[in-house]
Swiss-Prot record:
It comes from Bacillus cereus (strain Q1). Pfam families: JetA. InterPro entries: JetA. Disruption phenotype: When this gene is missing the Wadjet system does not confer plasmid-transformation resistance in B.subtilis. The gene is jetA. This is Wadjet protein JetA.
Amino acid sequence: MKKLFECIPENYFNLFAGKNRGFYAEVAFLLYEQFHINRAGILYSLMKDEVQELIETKEELGECIDIEDEIEEKEQDSAGRANEVLRRLKKLKWIDVEVRDQFEEFIVLPVYSSRILAVLKEICENRTIEYQRYCFTTYQLLTGVEAEERPASAILESEKYSEQLYDELTILLHNMKNHMETIAAKDDIQQVLEHHFGEYKKDIIDKSYHRLRTSDHVSRYRNKILERIQTWFLDDKFMKRAAEDAVESGYSANWEEAMDGLSKKMYRVEEIYSNLDEICNQIDARHYQYLRAVLDRSRYLSTYNDSINYKISYILEHIGQMDENILDSSLFRLVQLRQLQEASLLSPRKKKGVYEPEQHEVNEISDEMREELKAENIRRMEKVMNRKKIQKFVLEAMKGRQEIEMSELNLQNEDDALYLIYVYLYGYSKGTGYKLSEEPPEFITQKGYTFSNRTIKREN
């Protein structure tokens, strides 16, 4: 890997070092916009007119562009200053100038300038992130025709898109933290609410978080991607073919280097998609931390704004901004003193007396009532269904036989029909004295009840 200033000029970023850095940033974005319109080269005179128009617009708005302080020769008109701006861009190696047919000059962006401007423009635009696009593209690369015809390219590209997905999720996590710090610095509850329902909702909720956790969920293709990567790891023929493709395509110098590089890329893809739940959970936790921070800050500011300390500090702050003559002519008493009244004093605490419970009266129960309650309990116990009662019912119906069908059970009334449910319930457990057969039964109707006519066998 090369060093940074082996790839770009050493004084490249001096363009943004002066007091006109905001103006030069606009010129750079204007240059990048024209680069997209004229890919083969920007006509020098056209770019000069664009810069001249920008300078004149700034001056009409009352902004001062002191380009003369940064150049050796002073230019008075806007056309001359536009020329100096382009000459400075050329001197700092932001642009190259080519002379073509009929001595026309064209501006060409070096590779590093076009890439740096693309990154800067992306930062300023704060675009909506399509997280699922990275997953879908990775899935297509690993399962499409590219994986069969150019496996090395498919692996390298899938690792690149996986890294971009992970970077975007990490950026979202850090952006939430920045919004938390912004909320903590707000001094007014109105500012807190405006930031939450304005910037946070627009930049985080609408553009990233809501899509991430609903329609754009990143876990949709995760299992298929992991399955394909793990299958390739176990396929020696595919790995050899991918290594040969990497050597033939120039990605690697030899077969061993290709195998090592492709394995690392595949491990990285597997690691990213295996840890997706973890980073998504961190994003959820950070979002809830932000919401708690908004609530706590709003609650604190609403309480503080109603306090005496805030009101006094607010009055003193405005007094400090007033004219001294007004203060001299309109003095007022800050504290009003009144006679002490007994009602304003805190009442002394009274000692709590000893608790004295009410006397409990014991009512005697007659023998007749005791016998009646006892008989009621016996009747209630007789109605309770239990294992022994069901076992007795079934064995009495079998009358010494080894097996019978459930239709042979003696069903006399509705209470007996309830026994069928418990015969099923205990028929497949141990210790009941009987068991039900496993064969598919026939359904029959007997005395108005439909049930499966299973065979009951005596348990040895």
